[in-house]
Amino acid sequence: MKRLWTVFAITLLALTAAGPVLAQGDPFTGTWKLDVAKSKYDPGPAPQSQMRTWDASGQVTIEGVNAAGKPAKYGYTLKDDGKDYPTMGAIPNGAQTVAVKRLSPNKIEANFTRDGKHAETATFSVSKDGKVLNILAKGTSPTDGKPFTNMTVWEKQ
């Protein structure tokens, strides 16, 4: 009987310690605001503002004002299962699908395709404190085929 209580106590202790870790969930989930001043768009131009909402299922919606001052809304599904998922709305890179792999708990890589060809690779990294999301995106423009590199900084809301 004493052994049973010992096993029970150890199990309870382990579950209690794991609770906060399990409750934290995916570090990408939440609402993120683009810090335009800290972000770099090469060749540009940068959007005027953006908010990124990332839900627990991996659905990402981006809303804001583009460089021309017009409202913009688009999205995609970022599930780290390596499968292609369709994009939604007028995504700036012109991609129709995206596939994701997780590199670490706080880092994923997304590969976007346009007309069946690679359009962009984006690496998403959440800081250890969970307050900052950095996205490094490298690809080719859908309008002129020239390369672009964007390093964007997002603050958790």
Predicted regions located by residue number:
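Enrichment for repetitive, rod-forming helical segments
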Residues: 9-10, 40
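Hydrophobic small-molecule pocket/channel-lining residues, especially in calycin-type beta-barrels
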Residues: 21-157
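Bacterial N-terminal signal peptides that target proteins for export
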Residues: 1-9
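Cleavable N-terminal signal peptides
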Residues: 10-11, 21
